[in-house]
Design a protein with these regions (language model features):
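Structured, hydrophobic secondary-structure cores that serve as assembly/anchoring elements
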Residues: 41-46, 52, 64-66, 72-96, ...
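Extended, compositionally biased alpha-helical segments that mediate assembly or anchoring
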Residues: 239-279
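Residue-level signal for secondary-structure boundary sites
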Residues: 55, 94, 173, 211, ...
Length: 279
């Protein structure tokens, strides 16, 4: 995109497309209907259809109970408002015929996507179950991942439900050293960070995984576990000329929020790496 052809509506779309190339966690979130509009921080959206009805015993001759369900099951609050404010030097812009602006847009897009993924990774604190391995090596990691799969099965996750395992690069190395064989898929289809399938998990690697000291807070979860809503309103994108400088600039506001809608389908996998005794 050339700076001269700047249009807020076009830039808003450009910053939001291609999330599969820029994010890991964002592509693994709930895909069902989320009702409402995002215009500012503090907006409330409604997640529809994530609850399950109650099954009751039928007794002939007695009235049956009508379960009253709200039009939505859970609220989602827009809690995050992140911005970038980028200067584009007019001399550089002229020399590069607008390409400098295109580079700045791409870098802004990547930076916003990275911040978004780090936000979603923080939901490990709301997991319904935690599995620990304080001596994670290539020899012990398989049993830990099997426990994570077991936890999801015990949460009544259907076999056909999409389930994901997101790990840090250090933990992925343990899988490689353990000679774990992944069922390969098309990374262009599955998105950024995809390494293959194992134990019914789509395995992804992300630098957004949170750490506490030497503990890597990896996450095993289903598509139904985490919901996210985001927007970059065209009204919150501006091109302007800063004072006291020969430069142009643009600023962008990214609004989003998320929530855990099925804690039982989110497993926190705390892994502390240990030295390998044999490779």
């Amino acid at each position: 995109m050339a700076y001269e052809s700047f249009r807020p509506e076009i830039l808003a779309k450009e910053l939001m497309v291609g999330r599969g190339r820029d994010c890991v966690f964002k592509n693994l979130t709930y895909k069902g209907p989320i009702l409402g509009e995002i215009t500012k921080k503090g907006d409330v959206l409604h997640i529809a259809g994530v609850g399950r009805p109650t099954v009751r015993d039928y007794i002939p001759g007695e009235d049956i109970t009508l379960e009253q369900k709200a039009s939505h099951n859970q609220d989602l609050y827009i809690t995050e408002a992140k911005y970038v404010n980028v200067e584009v030097d007019r001399v550089d812009k002229a020399q590069a015929q607008g390409e400098v602006f295109g580079v700045e847009v791409r870098e802004a897009k990547k930076a916003l996507a990275q911040t978004l993924d780090e936000y979603i990774a923080g939901f490990h604190t709301q997991a319904g179950n935690t599995i620990e391995n304080t001596n994670c090596t290539s020899a012990t990691i398989l049993s830990t991942l099997a426990e994570a799969e077991q936890a999801l099965l015990e949460a009544d996750v259907p076999f056909e439900e999409e389930r994901f395992l997101v790990i840090s690069p250090a933990i992925y190395t343990k899988l490689v050293l353990g000679k774990i064989v992944f069922q390969q898929g098309n990374a262009d289809v599955f998105g950024k960070g995809f390494k293959g399938s194992y134990l019914n998990f789509g395995v992804y690697v992300s630098n957004s995984i949170k750490r506490t000291g030497d503990v890597h807070h990896c996450m095993a979860f289903t598509r139904q576990a985490i919901a996210l809503a985001e927007q970059i309103p065209a009204s919150m994108i501006e091109r302007y000329k800063p004072e006291k400088t020969f430069a142009d600039a643009f600023k962008v506001l990214h609004l989003y929020g998320g929530t855990v809608i099925r804690p039982a389908e989110l497993i926190r996998v705390d892994l502390t790496t240990a030295e390998e005794t044999a490779i």
